């Protein structure tokens, strides 16, 4: 089984080799899908300070709109969701080419969460719009969903979750070391790990609120709730004991836990939503009701998905390289 993991990793490495980017100091693109890693790999992103500097709860950072005057046909153009008003008013008029817009790094849903979505979508210069947290109103043919990915940016800005401040590269090295020693999914406990109850969002808009999901699953013998908070690396290690992780919606539709768990080799259980197309071909179980989590279904889902992690195409879909290449391919038509 470990040999299969190695072949899968090698295949992903070949895909990424075509997307190596210049070194950016301590803030570089990652291997695994990460919102700011995607930003760094796009052709235009407002500059490193704009990509790196935003922190939650603050007014949107501004970018220099002149940086977008050099956009060419087929380019990928990234901006933060919170900066879309400035992009629409100041950057879009300076662009003379057909491009793809890439947005993320906030909990906004798109297109419902941005009043200027229709104006942006009507622009003949916009070929496609790839965004995190694509909501149910996103039926426009130019809109495509994009993963929220992992969270390397929080700890890069300072200590968090029992972890000292660390660069994205250092965090990913820690993750890779754990992946190298973790058991394959087929050899794990055939139960569901849950830790979402430690982060209950007060302003949750989409899906069941987390306290409600916790109450619904609390008496389920197949769901193992984490009893105490752990340092992030310890939590990651604990997750690798289980075949499944349950991942309800967060403040936004998507959740870092979903993608983090896939990288850790967990089959992820999510609620049906507008994000379902993101999970095609991945070991993700989509349920209509959390009560579907029972022993017979877990046995069936385990038999169906446990071997998926050894497939190169599954490992590839967890990387920035895959999503960058996919966006370029779809834009080219």
Feature-to-residue mapping (PLM):
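Boundary detector for helix-to-coil junctions that initiate low-complexity/charged tails
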Residues: 1-3
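GIY-YIG nuclease catalytic motif and its immediate N-terminal context
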Residues: 294
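A short, glycine- and acidic-residue-rich donor-binding loop in the catalytic cores
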Residues: 256-260
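C-terminal accessory segments of extracellular proteins
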Residues: 289-290
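Nucleotide-sugar donor-binding catalytic core of glycosyltransferases
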Residues: 10-252, 271-275, 279-286, 297-333
């Amino acid at each position: 089984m470990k040999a299969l993991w190695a072949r899968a990793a090698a295949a992903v490495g070949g895909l990424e080799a075509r997307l190596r980017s210049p070194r950016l100091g301590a803030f570089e693109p990652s291997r695994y899908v990460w919102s700011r890693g995607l930003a760094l790999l796009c052709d235009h992103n407002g500059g490193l300070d704009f990509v790196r500097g935003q922190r939650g709860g603050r007014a949107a950072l501004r970018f220099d709109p002149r940086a977008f005057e050099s956009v060419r046909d087929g380019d990928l153009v990234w901006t933060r969701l919170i900066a879309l008003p400035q992009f629409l008013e100041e950057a879009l008029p300076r662009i003379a080419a057909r491009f793809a817009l890439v947005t993320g790094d906030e909990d906004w849903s798109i297109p419902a969460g941005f009043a200027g979505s229709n104006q942006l979508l009507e622009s003949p210069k916009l070929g496609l719009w790839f965004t995190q947290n694509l909501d149910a109103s996103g039926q426009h043919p130019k809109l495509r969903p994009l993963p929220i990915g992992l969270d390397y940016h929080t700890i890069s800005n300072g200590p968090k979750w029992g972890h000292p401040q660390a660069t994205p590269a250092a965090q990913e090295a820690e993750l890779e070391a754990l992946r190298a020693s973790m058991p394959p999914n087929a050899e794990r406990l055939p139960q569901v790990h849950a830790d979402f109850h430690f982060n209950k969002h007060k302003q949750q808009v989409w899906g069941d609120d987390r306290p409600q999901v916790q109450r619904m699953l609390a008496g389920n013998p197949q769901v193992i709730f984490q009893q105490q908070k752990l340092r992030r690396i310890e939590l990651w290690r604990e997750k690798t004991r289980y075949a499944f992780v349950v991942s309800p919606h967060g403040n936004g539709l998507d959740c870092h836990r979903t993608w983090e768990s896939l990288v850790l080799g967990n089959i992820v259980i999510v609620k049906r939503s507008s994000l379902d197309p993101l999970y095609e071909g991945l070991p993700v179980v989509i349920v209509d009701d959390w009560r579907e989590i029972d022993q017979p279904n877990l046995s069936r889902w385990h038999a169906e998905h446990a071997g998926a992690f050894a497939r190169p195409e599954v490992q590839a879909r967890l990387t920035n390289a895959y999503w960058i290449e996919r966006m370029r391919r779809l834009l080219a038509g």
